[in-house]
Amino acid sequence: MNILENINTEKRNPRSLNLDSMSIAEAVSLMIDEEYGVIEALKEQHRNITEVILATSYSLRNGGRIIYIGAGTSGRLGILDAVECPPTFSVDYNTIVGLIAGGEKAFIQAQEGAEDAANFGKEDLQSINLTAKDIVIGIAASGRTPYVIGALEYANSIGATTVAISCTKQAKISKYAKYSIEAVPGPEVLTGSTRLKAGTTQKLILNMISTLSMVSVGKVYQNLMVDVKPTNQKLIERSKNIICEVTGVDYTTAEKFYLKANKSVKVAIVMILNNCDYEKALAILKNNNNFIKS
């Protein structure tokens, strides 16, 4: 039985049949043109993406976590998105978690066969003490990865919300999830190499999930990352510039309040806008569910 026969990501792209005889310039043009399929795939899934973000936002507001889980490129993309959230939004590293078949070492070196064991998906979720408050997002371009299916089955069994993200229609993993996103950008230029368009598609979906979920819990004011964690000189300067941008104060004043606010951009802004001290600013934010109210 050919288990890959009807999977979109395994189909040949008629536009790249002569890839091996194209000039580099021709191949570059082709690969650029092929990326347009990514945007069309995302537009077609607008409603489903929206539903997923509403679900992830609900989970975060109610004490849950977002758990990405996948194998290979899909797993790496989940980790990549997850690890960027603490410095960008000052969330705990346990708020958005990325899990990959084969463990952390699989991020830099393929672990043969890890994705084929459904029980590994279950065990990885058990290792982080998954609860019913969490939302598990299974990612598999092919839509059939056993590791992901095992994870979704376990998540369902304990009452956690489940999501399946794939790049093929009628994906097998969709059957194991409450919500599904089947964004199909078309066959790859290099047949079956889902690190290409499928990977780009998945990354953009994860970008939307994490960013807009953070917006929903007050981590953003207007379009500014007011909960940025100042972990390097660039982010320290960005923090001060954000304070200037929102409040209209000069750089020196922004720097003074930044230090008074214990290097919290959000608290500094509230202190300036409300002409109050640090403790009062914290109380105002708590009363507003951690949102800056203009």
UniProtKB/Swiss-Prot annotation:
InterPro entries: Etherase_MurQ, Glucokinase_regulatory_CS, MURQ/GCKR, SIS_dom, SIS_dom_sf. It catalyses: N-acetyl-D-muramate 6-phosphate + H2O = N-acetyl-D-glucosamine 6-phosphate + (R)-lactate. GO terms for molecular function: carbohydrate derivative binding; carbon-oxygen lyase activity; ether hydrolase activity. Its EC number is 4.2.1.126. Keywords: Carbohydrate metabolism, Lyase. Pfam families: GKRP_SIS_N (PF22645). One of its GO terms (biological process) is amino sugar catabolic process. Residues 56-219 form the SIS domain. The active site is at 84 (proton donor), 115. Specifically catalyzes the cleavage of the D-lactyl ether substituent of MurNAc 6-phosphate, producing GlcNAc 6-phosphate and D-lactate. Together with AnmK, is also required for the utilization of anhydro-N-acetylmuramic acid (anhMurNAc) either imported from the medium or derived from its own cell wall murein, and thus plays a role in cell wall recycling. PANTHER family: GLUCOKINASE REGULATORY PROTEIN. NCBIfam families: N-acetylmuramic acid 6-phosphate etherase, PRK05441.1, PRK12570.1. Belongs to the GCKR-like family. MurNAc-6-P etherase subfamily. This is N-acetylmuramic acid 6-phosphate etherase. It comes from Francisella tularensis subsp. holarctica (strain LVS).
